[in-house]
Amino acid sequence: MVLPKNPFFTDLGVVGILGGDAFAQSVVTFDSRSKIMVINYPYRPEKLKVTDGIPLLDETEHHSIVNVRLGNNDLKVLFDTGAGGFLLYSTEDYNRLADISQVTNHGYGIVAAGITGLGKPVDIKKVSVPSINIMGKEFTNVGSTTTVMNGTIIGVDLLQYGKVIIDYMRRRFYFLPFEEGKIDMGGAPALWNVSILPRNERFEITTIWDSMKDTVAFGDEVININGTSLKDCPMSQMAVEEIMNAIPGDTGYIIIKKDNQEKRIEIRKEK
């Protein structure tokens, strides 16, 4: 896949993306415990039966889209190792299945930067889903935030719980859990009640959760995070998230600059 020059890739230190088409005639195994990715061609790994897997649902592209069970409902999801976290819940799927999800918080803003830059601000919900079943392995109390995208994603965190094998040639998906039994995922994620991203050649508040909606505004300039000046910080999501993640405990502060005045604002992590 050839894409135009993009600072997103430069910040990551990578030159591009390998899509599913690169593995169209292969079987790819992700094994986090061994810290390896194995590509088999053209044969399946030994002792792996076609009947042990489930079908890939995308008939036209080499995308790892499969059916999982969300409560008592079938849900198409894309397994994507490029997506952080466990569940990235699309707003459309949430709206369709809202009666089985518990909303714990509301927000407004931009969820994240992508290869095409920042999206538009949207309404966001923080939710907890009672159960997701992936090939017989049940994950309970699964937390996520809603995201405007084409479909729900199961992200790279799935690899913490089992080996994933994708047979692109025979269009089969396998999940082999490391342990038996249900896994409690801990509910809605604990996130800072504001998010900060590079925008308009500075750092701005780009997501506001309910507890902060009367304290800060979308687009407020942030010049300091918990004692770390952003003056020389690289204009990247990774850089600012590294600073946020380094804040000890569940409380901290930011300094915003508005109308040439600086103001210290307390922030905290919330579910």
PLM regions: where:
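Pepsin/retropepsin-fold aspartyl endopeptidases
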Residues: 1-271
